[in-house]
Amino acid sequence: MLIEIPNVFSKEEVNQLREELDARTWIDGNQTSGVMASTRKRNQQLDKDDPVVLRIGELIMARLLAHPLFVSAALPLQFYPPLFNRYQGGETFGYHIDNAIRSTSDGMVRTDLSATLFLSEPDTYQGGELVIQDTYGQQSIKLAAGSLVLYPSTSLHQVTPVTSGERTAAFMWLQSMVRDEGQRRLLFQLDQSIQALTAQAAPERELFNLTGVYHNLLRRWSEL
């Protein structure tokens, strides 16, 4: 399941974030790569321990945890804190699958979901599409600055070469309360239906029944 979430940050907020990020020191992006991915990866990143990275990462996580669509789709349990990358001058990241486990200062994170928050407007660079292969085929993603795409970490994906301009983004992984992607999809569809019926003032009894089904399935499938 691939979910696009528009306008996580406004254009003005993105400009402020970019001003801070662009002023930092960018380094070789292979610091977060596995052995196989490192042979396919050519980009730049900010140091994960940079205080600006840590502060903006906290801001991004807080914004996502307050976003109903993100919470409904991801059922987040734990983040691997956001990192930031930049592509320019033909830089690319060939097809790969993200590492299953990431280590943080608080322990280990199973990467159930990956997310990219775009911080460059799509008309300011050529190439740089996030191409994801999933059960529904191949999808090419290039969103407006401030928008985010969420997708299963099991997906084969790549960033195509940036042939002109500059593509800056935040990327992150998270562990969901529900490990299985199919179960998460069913819960998301059920939750979205409940929200739509609530907005249409559907009869309370039916809403109570559906809400009960949702929470009982979440109780059965969640791992905390």
Curated annotation (Swiss-Prot):
Xref: InterPro entries: Oxoglu/Fe-dep_dioxygenase_dom (IPR005123), PKHD_C (IPR041097), PKHD_hydroxylase (IPR023550), Pro_4_hyd_alph (IPR006620), Pro_4_hyd_alph_FE2OG_OXY (IPR044862)
SUPFAM superfamilies noted in UniProt: Clavaminate synthase-like
Record: residues binding 2-oxoglutarate: R167
EC number: 1.14.11.-
Binding site for Fe cation: H96, D98, H157
GO-annotated biological processes: DNA damage response; intracellular iron ion homeostasis
Domain Fe2OG dioxygenase: 78-176
Keywords: Dioxygenase, Iron, Metal-binding, Oxidoreductase, Vitamin C
Organism superkingdom: Bacteria
An annotated Gene Ontology molecular function: L-ascorbic acid binding
Pfam families associated with the record: 2OG-FeII_Oxy_3 (PF13640), PKHD_C (PF18331)
Keyword Metal-binding: yes
Family matches, as Gene3D superfamilies: q2cbj1_9rhob like domain (2.60.120.620), Rabenosyn, Rab binding domain (4.10.860.20)
Disulfide bonds: none
Keyword Nucleotidyltransferase: no
Cofactor note: Binds 1 Fe(2+) ion per subunit.
Protein name: PKHD-type hydroxylase Shewmr7_0698
